[in-house]
Amino acid sequence: MAYDDRETGLTVEDRGSKLGLPQNQDAEANVLAAMLLSPDVVEEAQVELQPDDFYRPIHKTIYTAMVDMYNSRIPIDSISLIDYLRSINKLDAVGGEAYILELMGQTLSLVNWQHHAAIVRRDSMLRELIGATNEINALAYNAPTDTKEVVELAESKLLKVTAREVKSSYKTLTEFCLLYTS
């Protein structure tokens, strides 16, 4: 029996094909705009997000470029980003100068960028979970007679999805001491 999605009225099976994978392009764009406007955001965003968290390939490319620029101590602004993307032959692939300048126009992005980053991360995690469950489905349908192996593989795939969240909640002793002695 397939369950209905209360919002869309679609079955679970139909939802993926009709609505696509979880993603929020506006949240992605706002995070990138905030990174363009503040070097502090670039530093913090690297802790919160990875390139694969971005659904749109152009957003992944822009994010990676800004992180590379930051790590190379290249100042991040629209002109420098356009120049950097041009130098690595990716400017046209991300929509050209027009898209970078469009991002710069989102000046309110600094206000809620952390919330938007959380949305990007949440949707990424949901996509990972969907991928893992699809793999688990395939394993179950092609299961050997020993189901223990299938269950272990399924557990492994689900744990892989949550591993990053668990890791990010742990702090080293030094981090803990710095946090509570300041």
Residue ranges of each PLM-predicted region?
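Conserved small/polar residues in nucleotide/adenosyl-binding loops
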Residues: 180-181
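Noncatalytic partner-interaction/assembly domains of nucleic-acid and motor enzyme complexes
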Residues: 1-124
